[in-house]
Amino acid sequence: IIYHSAQRSDIVTTFLSLCVLNACNADGIVKTIKCTLREHDLKLDNIVGIGTDNASVMVGVNHGVYKQLKADVPHLILIRCVCHSLQLATSAAVAEGLPRSLDYLVGDTYKSFARSFSRQQAYKELFGILNDGEEEPLKIVQACSTRWLSIATAVERVLHQWTELKAHFQVARLAEKCYSAEVLYSMYCDEINKAYLLFLRPVLTEVQRVNKSFEAHNADQTKLLDDLVHLLSSLIKKVVIPTASVDVYTTKVEDYLDPKPYLGYSFEKHVDDMKKTGLAADEEENLRKRCTKFILVLIEQIRQRLPDNIEILRKVSQLAVEKVLYVLKPSLVPLLEAMGIPTPSTRIDAIESQWRSITTVAWKDTSTTQKFWCEVYNYRDSYGENPFGELADFAISMLVLPYSNAEVERSFSQMNLLKTKLRNRLSPNTVNAIMVIRAGLKRNKKGCFDYELPEKTIRLIGTRDVYKVGVSKPSSSTGAPHQPEGLLGQVGDSSPDCDDDDLFTL
């Protein structure tokens, strides 16, 4: 859940609850969401947005979770997780645009070292000899779909150690009589494979940069979608003729293709070197076509996964602190009308008036957009009222939108660390209680080593009351674990400090 905490004067992203579904479909998910909100005294009407992946059960146009929730909350905003979208788009572009041998090259290079300590040691010794012992070899990582854009790091590591890996597999094919090493050595000898990776590296770096900004804890939410559109624009400019004027969302890029696009310094330099050693013209043409196709597929895949209302959401960048404090700035009315949040004309007039006069106050904390709007929210005049109250409420509602599902993935990782193969009998109640405690400690900026237990909790230790819980099993109606009322329920300020009237997102 993401909400504005007046107590902490901050935008808080935290774990709410672990729920057990009775039905693994859209109806079951919606029912569980509604019941969980009721259990935490949160109003369904206060949901501003919902962040999901691209699964049909979540975003299906006919009977998806979003469609059902929007029927109850007409102003609900859907934001598909950009991190998931970029991963899927990149995977599709690699599969359709590039030779399958590249996937084998990167994947089997990892596999050859993954479970063999002797190979790792042999490679480490060879690497030290070739580099005079000045540096250690970087670990070869696995490119897999479960880690967002892990292929970017995998490609970078392989390229950085190309010569050393080539020498290693040359030795391994003779010493071990290994067919896999023989195949990999022949692939490392093919300079066209290296050219593909040199082309991929800067493109994946750009995509990874945007992905990291969406994953970050302290990113400015008002600028994230601008970064995504700039990525799309940058990819288009790589393959179209310089004089072309294209719309990043709708233009058919194939109609404006550059016959010989510039595909990066390292790639072009390597191609020039290959020409000197006999690269045929048809081979170069095929190489460039495959690289161009990769970019075209990537552009199309990103377009398909862009939020339907991206142009509206991009207008949220008007709320960035540096733009707010401009004396001359565009009206906020188009954004107010586009968001679809119930706003009577009188309220729009009030917000627009406050938007124009906000520069009349000397604001102290303008380091980040979040801190600035929290200061505006808490501002009081001589009469004890906030003259910018409506504007601050609207800005806060935009800042709590779920632009990324990175925190959800982190919660999954925590749960996997808790409920392992050795601890596979942990009940949902216990796992939920531990995760709630961790989230509460994090919200309070405490740790297990410096948190002071309440006196009431200390008195319970060693008594039977410490084991008392409100409900020992999940609710039959929702499957959502109830918060324990014993010792676990009193540690870590387990309930989010989200007031009844606060807007929030899931």
Located regions from the model:
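Alpha-helical structural modules in large enzymes and assemblies
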Residues: I1-L506
